[in-house]
């Protein structure tokens, strides 16, 4: 088994500032699938980096039986240094810049370099690891299949995402253009990819890191790349993905107090949270629009009209 660590350049500003990001590789030297792991595409989502570290540590301890695993453990070095989701002062979201443009904005240039590096290696699967709100549960997030890929690729993605044993959720094109996310752009290029949302950002939460590590190892086991004990994640075994929604949104401003917890099953019209004025009067009650599970809750108590304050996986 061969291991390697290297740095690749991601910007073309050689005369001013050259940025490089780390790449980790582990090769069994036996034929098999190639899996890429990507993490910290948003600079404040450091838990994903820890998950990559722990996955590689586990693989070195248990041995990779076949194939290879490559990883970008810390993509957004600029955001990481500034504890920011974005890559620069223009507040570019790197995960809305794919597949990128070699002559575009800084975000588009970085995205192009990353995208080309991954696609040229012809991987069998890419797992993009993110972190959500501080109060959130880990889940596997897949792109809507009908619009972005062939049925064959979509079924591969579902099979791999389901093998994580995490809550399985389908993203929504209504919220943003999924064509410009890393996973969406890869699927459009014919490469199976999905996202793992593993707990809160900003800090490394060991419980979330463990869940994320086990989810990735469960996928590798499904691909017959390792022999690993059954994963501890057993949240959802639904054959059909649940639907991601950011509803209900706030229509008033004030202080929000939640009446549900991440991971909790909810019913239609159930009270999820109430918004209070500075005098303590209830200005608004937010209710579930459909049955499902709570994925995460807003980090801040202050809310404004039109703001997303909760993430829910609705039952189909």
What are these regions (language model features)?
Residues 1-316:
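Structured catalytic-domain cores with a bias toward divalent-metal coordination
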């Amino acid at each position: 088994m061969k291991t390697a660590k290297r740095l690749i350049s991601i910007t073309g500003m050689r005369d001013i500032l050259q940025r490089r990001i780390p790449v980790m590789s582990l090769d069994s030297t036996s034929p098999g699938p190639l899996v890429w792991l990507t993490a910290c595409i948003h600079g404040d989502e450091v838990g994903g980096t820890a998950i990559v570290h722990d996955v590689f540590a586990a693989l070195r301890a248990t041995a990779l039986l076949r194939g290879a695993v490559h990883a970008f453990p810390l993509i957004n070095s600029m955001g990481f240094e500034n504890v920011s989701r974005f890559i620069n002062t223009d507040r570019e979201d790197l995960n809305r810049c794919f597949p990128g443009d070699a002559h575009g904005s800084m975000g588009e240039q970085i995205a192009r370099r990353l995208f080309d590096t991954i696609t040229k290696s012809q991987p069998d699967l890419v797992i993009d690891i993110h972190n959500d709100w501080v109060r959130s549960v880990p889940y596997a997030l897949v792109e809507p299949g009908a619009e972005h890929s062939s049925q064959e690729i979509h079924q591969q993605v579902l099979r791999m995402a389901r093998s994580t044993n995490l809550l399985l959720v389908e993203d929504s094109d209504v919220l943003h253009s999924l064509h410009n996310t890393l996973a969406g752009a890869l699927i459009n290029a014919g490469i199976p990819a999905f996202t793992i949302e593993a707990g809160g950002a900003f800090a490394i939460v060991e419980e979330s890191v463990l869940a994320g590590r086990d989810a990735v190892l469960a996928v590798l086991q499904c691909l017959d790349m390792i022999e690993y004990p059954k994963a501890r994640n057993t949240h959802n075994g639904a054959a059909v993905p649940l639907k991601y929604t950011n509803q209900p949104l706030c229509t008033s401003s004030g202080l929000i107090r939640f009446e549900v917890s991440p991971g909790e099953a909810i019913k239609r019209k159930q009270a999820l949270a109430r918004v209070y004025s500075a005098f303590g009067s209830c200005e608004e009650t937010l209710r579930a629009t459909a049955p499902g599970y709570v994925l995460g809750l807003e980090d801040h108590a202050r809310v404004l009209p039109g703001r997303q304050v909760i993430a829910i996986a609705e039952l189909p």
